[in-house]
A protein has these predicted regions:
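Alpha-helical bundle segments that constitute or directly flank the non-heme di-iron/ferroxidase center
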Residues: 1-25, 50-57, 132
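Hydrophobic packing residues in well-ordered alpha-helices of helical domains and bundles
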Residues: 2, 6-13, 91-98, 123, ...
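Amphipathic, well-ordered alpha-helical segments in soluble domains
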Residues: 12-19, 48, 101-104, 108, ...
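A short secondary-structure junction motif
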Residues: 16-19, 23, 59, 108, ...
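Short, charged helix-helix connector/hinge segments
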Residues: 26-30
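Short, contiguous alpha-helical
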Residues: 31-76, 114-149
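Acidic/histidine-rich alpha-helical segments that form the ligand environment
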Residues: 74-117
C-alpha cells in the first residue's frame, strides 16, 4: 500500500500551520477571489477536511459508504451554500479551526490500516490525500497576500 500521502499531507499541514501563524488579521480579511477571503478559503479547507474526517471515521468503524454519500461531480452548490456559514465565523477562529481539523484528519487517515485504505477507489467519498486540496488553496492564499511590485 502506497502511504506517501502521509508525508504529503504532513507537508501541506506544516505549510498551513506556518501560514496561519504569520497571517495578520488584515490579511485574513483579504480577498482571494471574487467570493472568498483568506479566512473563508481556510474555512473551505476546514469544511472539506471535516467531511473527510467524517468518512474516515466511518471507514475506521468499518461502516459501508452509501450511494447518497458519493460526492457529486459538481460541488459548486456545496461550496456556495456553505460560504455564508463559513463567513459567519470569526476569521482568526476559522484559521485556527482549519489547522485543528487538518491535524485531526491527517492523524486519522495515517492510522487507518492498509486493508481499509486499499478498499477505497475513485468513487469513494473519502480521499485520504488531503494535501492536494489543501495545497491548491494555500497557493491561492499565498498569491493573494503576496506584495504587489
Amino acid at each position: 500500500m502506497d502511504r506517501s500521502f502521509v508525508a504529503a499531507n504532513g507537508r501541506e499541514l506544516a505549510r498551513m500551520r506556518a501560514l496561519v501563524s504569520r497571517l495578520s488579521d488584515r490579511q485574513l480579511g483579504a480577498m482571494v477571489n471574487e467570493y472568498w477571503t483568506v479566512a473563508g478559503v481556510l474555512g473551505h479547507i476546514a469544511f472539506w477536511d471535516g467531511c473527510a474526517l467524517y468518512f474516515a471515521g466511518k471507514l475506521q468503524r468499518r461502516e459501508p459508504f452509501t450511494a447518497s454519500e458519493n460526492e457529486p461531480g459538481d460541488v459548486d452548490w456545496i461550496n456556495d451554500s456553505s460560504r455564508p456559514l463559513i463567513d459567519a465565523i470569526a476569521p482568526r477562529a476559522l484559521a485556527e479551526l482549519a489547522v485543528s481539523i487538518a491535524e485531526d484528519i491527517d492523524e486519522l487517515v495515517a492510522s487507518l490500516p492498509d486493508e481499509l485504505l486499499a478498499s477505497l477507489d475513485e468513487t469513494s467519498p473519502l480521499n485520504p490525500v488531503r494535501a492536494d486540496h489543501r495545497g491548491e488553496h494555500l497557493d491561492e492564499i499565498e498569491a493573494a497576500i503576496r506584495p504587489r511590485t
